[in-house]
Regions:
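N-terminal presequence-like segments and adjacent domain-start helices
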Residues: 1-14
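Structured beta-strand/loop patches that form or line metal/cofactor-binding pockets in enzymes
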Residues: 20-41
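Amphipathic, hydrophobic secondary-structure cores in small proteins
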Residues: 39-41, 46-66
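Amphipathic alpha-helical coiled-coil segments
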Residues: 11-14, 18-21, 25, 75, ...
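Conserved "boundary/linchpin" sites in short secondary-structure elements
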Residues: 50-53, 91-102
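C-terminal structural segments of small proteins and small subunits
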Residues: 71-96
Length: 102
């Protein structure tokens, strides 16, 4: 059984790794689109959107209600991509923690 110093060292290393990954996630940028690419959104890892671009043809083709639905679709797609990318970055730390618990 590992002694207390070894356990504390493991916890410290994992904490540092989590902080490093968190900084990496916050710095990443995710781009997503609506189904037919009428709307493109870009968001940062901290969840803030940095741009929402609407194709001018969509503005001529759809009414306000449809445009809002298309924007919402692109935003939700972006949030989903961000969640997946964040989970992928944190997966090694989570697996490592599980192996320590076992």
């Amino acid at each position: 059984m590992p002694d207390m110093d070894e356990l504390l060292d493991q916890v410290r290393k994992q904490t540092e790794e989590v902080q490093r990954i968190q900084r990496s996630v916050e710095a990443m940028e995710v781009k997503a689109h609506s189904r037919q690419n009428e709307v493109t959104v870009v968001l940062r890892g901290d969840g803030r959107f940095t741009s929402i671009d609407i194709d001018p043809r969509a503005l001529r083709q759809y009414d306000a209600r449809n445009i809002s639905e298309i924007v919402l679709e692109a935003v939700n797609n972006g949030l989903q991509k961000l969640a997946e990318a964040s989970s992928a970055k944190f997966a090694p730390v989570i697996e490592s923690a599980k192996s320590i618990e076992a």
